[in-house]
């Protein structure tokens, strides 16, 4: 595993340890990587978090997956503790699993927009979560939906969208989410300039929670594309879609309260953030002897494609990625997998919880990337986003 990725994983592990213990080690000399807590301490946290198999998971498979994680995690943590960044592929993948399960960068399931107070990862983030709940994070979560084809569900969908204008029925998502709906599910669309009429069936479900059988579906009928649109770093990866109610649709939820193009959110001046979306099953299959995608699915109960909240920090300013020639992407380290594309980055501890960027991709342990509203306000305003 490449050393830059390992350095970032080590920093995340150290951040989680510092949050649990003020006496945890700080940065190594030269700021190359952060020293994690002693291996045993971190593994104790992981073991506690994974003490009971999730429902509907084969217990034998779960225990085997847990043992693989703990074995490779121990070896990797011992190396990092002594400053050795030469992790093999399985040790590196185990570190990625650890930062999710030990609370360093968790991905919290939501139920009625709330985090389960018994979630084993909640302790590290309890203060922030309490503050976010007081600011109305549950109401904001209600505006986030799963974009899916006809008969869509947690294993059959394309990404995340968020309601930004209830009166006009507008949601914001990525251009590449719309593109994948066409390519992966054959959703027919007709182009007319910078707009797409959705001739096939594409919808958004504003529930999509693991605890609920309810749906809150609206049909996506038209998509507006910004000038210079493109996927990931190859253009402005954004789209504003218009939705219409179905015969059984309830009233739309309240939209997100504020889209912000404040430059402070693109420079790291305000660093704490969170996103709400629908992460899919991870594809961590680059281990040498272990299928880490299988391990992650078993350990976390296959609860993917459902609504989650992931907290994190700002990591990189505009133009940091070599492909970001337009200087429009910022970096963050919240835990995301495919399916979270189209999620809004929120300053979740600020008054009115402003949303300031649109997540479009990345990799756990390196960086995730999001389209900065400060960089592309004019292009987004032209297709219906209000700042």
Swiss-Prot record:
Regarding protein family, the annotation reads: Belongs to the peptidase S1 family.
Role played: Possibly a dedicated protease for substrate gasdermin bGSDM; cleaves the bGSDM precursor, releasing the pore-forming moiety, which integrates into the membrane and triggers cell death. Involved in defense against bacteriophages. When this probable 4 gene operon (bGSDM-FE772_23060-FE772_23065-FE772_23070) is inserted into E.coli it provides nearly 100-fold protection against phages T5 and T6 and about 8-fold against phage T4. The operon without bGSDM no longer protects against phage.
Per UniProt, the keywords (alphabetical) are: Antiviral defense, Hydrolase, Protease, Serine protease
- GO terms for molecular function, please? serine-type peptidase activity
* Protein name per UniProt: Probable serine protease FE772_23060
Biological process, per Gene Ontology: defense response to virus; proteolysis
Provide the species name.
Lysobacter enzymogenes
Q: What is its EC number?
A: 3.4.21.-
What Gene3D superfamilies does the entry give?
Answer: Trypsin-like serine proteases
């Amino acid at each position: 595993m490449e050393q830059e990725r390992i350095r970032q994983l080590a920093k995340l592990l150290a951040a989680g340890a510092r949050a649990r213990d003020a006496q945890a080690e700080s940065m190594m000399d030269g700021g190359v990587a952060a020293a994690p807590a002693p291996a045993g301490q971190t593994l104790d946290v992981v073991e506690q978090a994974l003490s009971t198999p999730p429902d509907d998971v084969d217990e034998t498979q779960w225990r085997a997956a847990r043992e693989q994680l703990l074995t490779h995690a121990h070896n990797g943590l011992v190396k990092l503790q002594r400053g050795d960044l030469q992790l093999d592929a399985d040790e590196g993948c185990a570190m990625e699993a650890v930062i999710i399960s030990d609370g360093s960068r968790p991905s919290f399931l939501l139920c009625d927009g709330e985090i389960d107070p018994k979630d084993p990862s909640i302790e590290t983030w309890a203060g922030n979560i309490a503050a976010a709940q007081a600011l109305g994070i549950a109401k904001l979560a209600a505006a986030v939906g799963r974009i899916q084809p006809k008969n869509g569900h947690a294993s059959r969908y394309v990404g995340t969208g968020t309601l930004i204008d209830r009166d006009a029925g507008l949601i914001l998502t990525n251009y590449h989410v719309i593109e994948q709906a066409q390519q992966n599910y054959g959703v027919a669309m007709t182009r007319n300039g910078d707009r797409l009429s959705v001739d096939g069936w594409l919808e958004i479900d504003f529930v999509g929670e693991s605890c609920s059988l309810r749906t809150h579906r609206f049909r996506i009928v038209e998509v507006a594309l910004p000038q210079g649109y493109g996927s990931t770093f190859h253009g402005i990866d954004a789209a504003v879609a218009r939705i219409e109610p179905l015969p059984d649709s309830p009233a739309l939820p309240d939209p997100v309260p504020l889209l912000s193009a404040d430059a402070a959110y693109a420079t790291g001046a305000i660093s704490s953030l969170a996103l709400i979306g629908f992460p899919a099953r991870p594809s961590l299959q680059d281990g040498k002897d272990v299928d880490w995608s299988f391990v992650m699915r078993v350990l976390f109960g296959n609860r993917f494609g459902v609504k989650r909240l992931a907290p994190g920090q700002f990591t990189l300013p505009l133009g940091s990625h070599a492909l970001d020639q337009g200087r429009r992407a910022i970096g963050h380290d919240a835990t995301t997998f495919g399916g979270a594309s189209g999620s809004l980055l929120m300053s979740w501890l600020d008054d009115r919880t402003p949303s300031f960027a649109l997540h479009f991709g990345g990799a756990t342990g390196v960086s995730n990337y999001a389209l900065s509203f400060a960089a592309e306000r004019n292009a987004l305003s032209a297709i219906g986003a209000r700042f």
